[in-house]
Amino acid sequence: MNVYERTQQRLKTVFDLFDNIYVSFSGGKDSGVLLNLCIDYIRQHGLQRRIGVFHMDYEIQYRDTLDYVNRTLAANADILDVYRVCIPFKVQTCTSMFQQYWRPWDGSMRDIWVREMPEGSLTQHDFPFFTDEMWDYEFQNRFAEWLHRRSGAKRTCCLIGIRTQESFNRWRTIYSDRNHYRCLLYTSPSPRDL
């Protein structure tokens, strides 16, 4: 069985078991392939359902990546529920000797934003759990819980595209024996059927 066939098997399992599915989509190669596989799966199998797309918009991004994200979301609006978040969470930085983190979409720095916030974006006011001390990765985890409650789903699945060849830590995350669901490996457990 080749990688594509194995992916189709895994997607069938995901779509059979979870009533709420969303893809974490950065606009990069890995998440782009995964999102397009999901879109194709829905269309090829005639599924009458939508999937969520969680896009953390970091304000500063390559123009081609922004164009790709916008094009992909617009072309598939009929089956995608888009959660494009523009949040001033803390983000690690190695470009400053004076700051350990920076904040995209920081309202107090609006006059130097790199670009305008995209129309229809979700902001910190849409998330009651957001605090100024929150880091981007903490926000991701809290978003999953928020979306699960908001959707009223029985089971929520977040799909993340990862190439393990890029990092030993990524490889360890994927090939860990700690987390199983119906004989399938997954990266991290969450409470309440997430």
What feature does the model see in each segment?
Residues 1-188:
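ATP-dependent adenylation/nucleotidyltransferase module used to activate substrates
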Residues 189-194:
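A short, hydrophobic C-terminal helix/tail in secreted or cell-surface proteins
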